[in-house]
Curated annotation (Swiss-Prot):
Its cofactor is [8Fe-7S] cluster; [7Fe-Mo-9S-C-homocitryl] cluster. It is an enzyme of class 1 (oxidoreductase). It catalyses: N2 + 8 reduced [2Fe-2S]-[ferredoxin] + 16 ATP + 16 H2O = H2 + 8 oxidized [2Fe-2S]-[ferredoxin] + 2 NH4(+) + 16 ADP + 16 phosphate + 6 H(+). It comes from Rhodobacter capsulatus (Rhodopseudomonas capsulata). One of its GO terms (biological process) is nitrogen fixation. Binds 1 [8Fe-7S] cluster per heterodimer. Binds 1 [7Fe-Mo-9S-C-homocitryl] cluster per subunit. [8Fe-7S] cluster binds at C77, C103, C169. This is Nitrogenase molybdenum-iron protein alpha chain. The keyword Membrane does not apply.
Length: 499
């Protein structure tokens, strides 16, 4: 609909509003009224000085409020935001899923946080640890079981540098004192132990889990006495932290290549250790990739240690160049930036020459986490049109900060599986970039190319100049472009009735 519409902006806006109204008709009146606040139209308001960019007005989009009970939300919980996002990539710490086995099992190794090291010896990212709560633990409390689990981990994995306790819902409901257990075991085994109150019922999405995890980093890492290794670390004038990049598909290995080429030294990144986290306050600048999940700790470090921070985006040539140029240290770094940009210019020209003729003017719909939002720039550089976009757990400021990247189209917040499917059916974009829950398989069944933007779908990295072909190739050339329903034999009962 959006990509083929030849009328003016007013006609397009009317069509999109009609589409939203049509989708909402499936709900009861009360749910319909609530969901209507999350769906809106991005309409042009004025031109920037740069005529190629439009300003859009984010009209009446409500965000960061509770999902409507009974609808199939694509959000996660606070536990997912803490364990799965912020703490999960810290590779030499053991992360205990404290509670029933299910939460840890279903979140086991989903994030594709790549790491160096020997699994089970000095790295534990892909391993699952749980206190396996049973009914008696709910009744009598689980503090003793937690203590025993910590002792077992310390005995079985002596090279682990620390432990985090990721609380599941029952822990908060029964009132277990995980902070007291952490302090006690810290003295006994002399390792960092971090209690994280990330029970899934807290907040409205995984976003509060990010905030809680950031606070745990502040309280149990940064505000503790410095370790001997941190005291011995000698900071340099060009030390930077890469924050909010969780090394999905190797992204955190790709980004430092460019940063080190311009003369910066990365001391904390997505392939992280506890020691790197501890020395993070010694950096000169924080480079934040996922603003929504890690802006809290960046703001704290700015206030406490006077470390500035800036957002960066290594998706697509235009934003890579802008990000390299904005982080100015001195004339030496600035000169290096221009040399690096010139070095990769032939590669960029080759990528644009290969992909732009076949992709320019094609439409793409996005439904992503705020971390994935910058991916739109890779499509923008190729002249693709954003037909619809939205976030799972964004706050109002996320829409305000990123609204100018979206041309006229549909805006959806905390969209349900039903709504997203109906929008895609009606708009029929050339590409959908979203997640794996209620998004990936319905879209592929429609025969629409799909790019999985949460864990890179066994692909990656997507950061850097050389990553563009990895991001752009697969959706267009794989067999799943054909609708699976067209090649699947009819169900036996249908075949019998047709005969």
């Amino acid at each position: 609909m959006a990509k083929d519409h030849a009328g003016g902006p007013e006609d397009l806006e009317r069509l999109v509003r009609d589409l939203i109204a049509e989708v909402l008709e499936a709900y009861p009146a009360k749910a319909q009224k609530k969901r209507a606040k999350h769906l809106s139209v991005a309409g042009a308001t004025s031109e920037d000085a740069d005529a190629s960019r439009h300003r859009v007005e984010m009209r009446h989009v409500k965000s960061n409020i509770k999902s409507v009970p009974g609808v199939l939300t694509i959000r996660g919980c606070a536990y997912a935001g803490s364990k799965g996002v912020v703490w999960g990539p810290i590779k030499d710490m053991v992360h205990i899923s404290h509670g029933p086995v299910g939460c840890g099992t279903y979140s086991w190794s989903q994030r594709r946080n790549y790491y160096t090291g020997k699994t089970g010896v000095d790295s534990f990212v892909t391993m699952q640890f749980t206190t396996d709560f049973q009914e008696k633990d709910i009744v009598f409390g689980g503090d003793k079981k937690l203590e025993k689990t910590i002792d077992e981990i310390n005995e079985l994995f002596p090279l682990s540098k620390g432990i985090t306790i990721q609380s599941e819902c029952p822990i908060g409901l029964i009132g277990d004192d995980i902070e007291a257990v952490s302090k006690k075991k810290n003295k006994e085994i002399n390792k960092t132990i971090v209690p994280v109150r990330c029970e899934g019922f807290r907040g409205v999405s995984q976003s509060l889990g990010h905030h809680i995890a950031n606070d745990a980093v502040r309280d149990w890492i940064f505000e503790q006495p410095e370790s001997e290794a941190t005291k011995a670390f000698e900071p340099g004038p060009y030390d930077v932290n890469i924050i909010g990049d969780y090394n999905i598909g190797g992204d955190a290995w790709a980004s430092p290549i460019l940063l080190e080429e311009i003369g910066l030294n990365v001391i904390w990144s997505g392939d992280a250790t506890l020691a790197e986290m501890e020395r993070a306050p010694k950096a000169k600048l924080n480079l934040i990739h996922c603003y929504r999940s890690m802006n809290y700790i960046c703001r704290y470090m700015e206030e406490k240690y006077s470390i500035g921070w800036m957002e960066y985006n290594f998706f697509g040539p235009t934003q890579i160049e802008a990000s390299l140029r904005i982080g100015k240290f001195d004339e030496t770094i600035q000169a290096n930036v221009e040399k690096v940009i010139a070095k990769y210019r032939p590669l960029v020209d080759g990528i644009l020459a290969k992909y732009k003729p076949r992709l320019e003017g094609k439409s793409v719909m996005l439904y992503v986490r705020p971390r994935s939002a910058p991916r739109r720039h890779a499509y923008d550089d190729l002249g693709m049109v954003i037909a619809g976009t939205g976030y799972e757990f964004a706050h109002n400021d996320d829409y305000k900060r990123t609204g100018h990247y979206v041309k006229e189209g549909t805006i959806y917040d905390d969209v349900t599986g039903y709504e997203l499917e109906k929008f895609i059916e009606k708009i029929r974009p050339d590409l959908v970039a979203s997640g794996i829950k209620e998004e990936k398989y319905p879209v592929q069944k429609m025969g629409i190319p799909f790019r999985q933007m949460h864990s890179w779908d066994y692909s990656g990295p997507y950061h850097g100049y050389w990553a563009s072909p990895i991001l752009l190739d697969a959706p267009w050339d794989k067999p799943h472009r054909a609708s699976s329903w067209k090649i699947t034999p009819a169900a036996p009962w249908k075949a019998a009735s047709e005969a």
